[in-house]
Amino acid sequence: MAANGSPLSATGDYGAKTSREAAQTARRTTRAGPEPFGDPLSGILLVAEPAAGAANARVVDALRRSLATVKLVEAYVTWIHSDLLEEILSLEPGALVAVGPAAARAIDSLDYPLARMAFSEVPEGSWFAWTKGASGLRLPALAPALEDEDAKRHFWRAFLALRALAPEEAAGRL
């Protein structure tokens, strides 16, 4: 029951459960990277590899700007950490994106029980069926793209695959 006495909808129940589990995981987790950002209920989860030292702030800023460019500002971004499996299980994303080879290896090492394909086995920038209900996308590392023009072009070519998840794009496919 909601606080006003009316019954909760199934969507409301699920949203509350997922929000609570994500908050519990975040409180318990010792993170090596920056704080996660975005909406954990967006259905889009990016797992990024932290950059070395002060470059973390630049990577966070670049990810925020890049997501805004493809109209996915609500996508949830987290970093490689010890409770990543629990976080993925609680969020149940429809799209899971590995940003960088270390993120791809970290996801693969979780031995996710329903995974059909390993992130490390797919080409960068190509969507694949990660589980029956979730798509996966592997991207190059972002930190090198902040320093090198060729790496930047390579990152962007792969990153633009995320446009398929933008609300206008999704509506256009219906």
Stretches found by the model and what they are:
Residues 1-174:
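A polyanion-binding, active-site-adjacent surface
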